[in-house]
Each structure stands twice: as C-alpha cells, then as structure tokens.
Amino acid sequence: MKVTRKATPASRAAAFTALPPASQLATLAAWLEFAEEVYGQARLALGQISDNAHDEALYLFLRTLDWSLESGPEVLEHPLTPSQRIALRQVLHARAVTRTPAAYLTREAWLGGLRFYVDERVIIPRSYFVELIPRLADLLPEGTKVKRAADVCTGSGCLAILLAEHFPSAKVDGLDLSPEALAVAAINVKTLKAGKRVTLHRSDVFDALPPPAKPSEAYDLIISNPPYEPSAHVDKQDPEFAAEPRLAHDGGPDGLVIVRKLLRQARERLAPHGVVAVEIGGLRKAVNREFAALAPAWLETEDGSNCVFVVRAEKLRAWAV
C-alpha cells in the first residue's frame, strides 16, 4: 500500500483549475507536463498502475485518446483536436479531483502481458507473482508436471489465469469470498478463453472445497495474494486505495487472519511434493516469528522487496496447530 501526504478536496481542485490556455496544451507532451504538476500538487497516491506520475498519466491519456500503448515518442508532439483536449481535461479531473484510480477510469489493468477487465468490484491487479509464477516449477521435484493449482483470493482472476497460461496442462481453481469479484473474474476467464482450464469458486479460503478424495486431486501449487493489511492501516488508506473493496485489503487486526486459515487448510490439500506461496507485503518479520516452525523461504524479487514466502507440504503436515 502506498501512502502519501493528505491533500484537501479544495487543494486538489485548486491544483487542477489552474489550467493553462488551450493554446498552451496543444500536444500530448504539454498535457503530460501539466498532469505531472497536478499529480504533485494534489498529492495523488500512486502504485496501482505505476509508481510515478509521468507513466500513469501517459497511460491514462493514451487510453483516453484510444492511441496504442506502444506509440512512439512522435505522438507527444501530435496536435490535439479540441474534442481530444476536452477528453483529456475530463479524465484528468476525475483522476485528480475525485481521486478515482486510473484503472477504474480505463476499466482495465495489465499484468504479465495480458489485459484484464477491472472495475470497482475488485482490487486493481498488482502482484509480485507476475514475475514469480514462471519460477514456481523450480520449487517442485525435477520433472514434476503441474496438473492442479489454486489461486486463493483470486479477485479479478488475474493470477489464476496467469497460472493457467504458464502451466498449460494444469487445472486451476480460482477462489474468492466476494461474489462481486468473481463476476469480474468470470469476465476475464471468458475474454481470455481460459474457461477450460480455470474454474471459479465462491469460497472463504478453502471452505467450499473439501480436501481431495484421491491423490490425483491434490494441488501441486497453491498461491495467494490475500488481504494482509492490518485493519488499522486500512482505515488510513489514501482515497485511491480506499476506492478498492475493503475485503481485498483487510487482513484483520494483525494482517494475518487469512494467512493462518490458508496455511491450516493448505496442508490437507497439497500433494506430498506440493508448495504454497503467499504474498504478504511488509509482514515478513511477523510471518517469520509466528510461522517459524514452517521454515518459510522467501523468494527474491527484482526490486528486492522479497515479500512472497513459500512453505512445503511436508512442513505443513508436521506443523502442530
């Protein structure tokens, strides 16, 4: 979760209303320069699409203009029509004054090279699993073919679909407690033609899915990017993050309520060689302290945050809870 200094509605509006004459905002480059000033003055929270104002504003403007995200630098100086300038003004107003997240304005988010539909019913997709999923097979015995996998707290379905993309022989279960989130996930499963490999379930962790009746039904992989923010932190979120469903953020008093349940239930559902991988934000010390008996291993990420831990099935089965 990103946290910025608070700006009042009046200060946000003031930052936006200082709009230069249209003649000074005749190109996308000029609008980008203005947008960066607005982002800074309004103290907008970042981290849902990009961690910097320039990249988020560029994405938002290209989408608003219906220009390709692969556009070259030449588009920056392309003259804008009056209607295009109006459209950019409207979308910047929505972003800066109402603090609407960019992904909710464009109704999309990109992850792992795939476009996912999103709206206010789901958390905006962002996860270190996008870089870690290709490495999960290395955690299994050599030659193991992933046949069964699960994504717990699937939200928009993005990680379940990415699992299916990377492990084409796998049947993937996507589980979520929210029927609203599952409705969005169903859109993405259909749009990305993943219906034969991804099955969605309404479930509080694994409550709706009993332990496997036979070994072939056990999971090789279980992943989860669960709600892990302590409740008190959720109460203080910036408006952009507060616009997302609270259910997707709130991990209980210490952030670990869902994680505890997941680990307890995973031990009955993993194959003997299986692993569970969980993204946990800034709770690494808390995880190491509470689950020391499980010997959690932390996966390295490109930015060094290393906030995803892995536990093996044999450790879970020997765990005294």
Stretch-by-stretch model annotation:
Residues 134, 169-171, 175-321:
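S-adenosylmethionine
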Residues 1-19, 23-26, 30, 297-299, ...:
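Accessory (non-catalytic) regions of SAM-dependent nucleic-acid methyltransferases
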Residues 32, 57, 88-89, 156, ...:
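A general structural signal for well-ordered alpha-helical segments in protein cores
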Residues 60, 99, 129, 159, ...:
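Residue-level signal for inorganic ion chemistry
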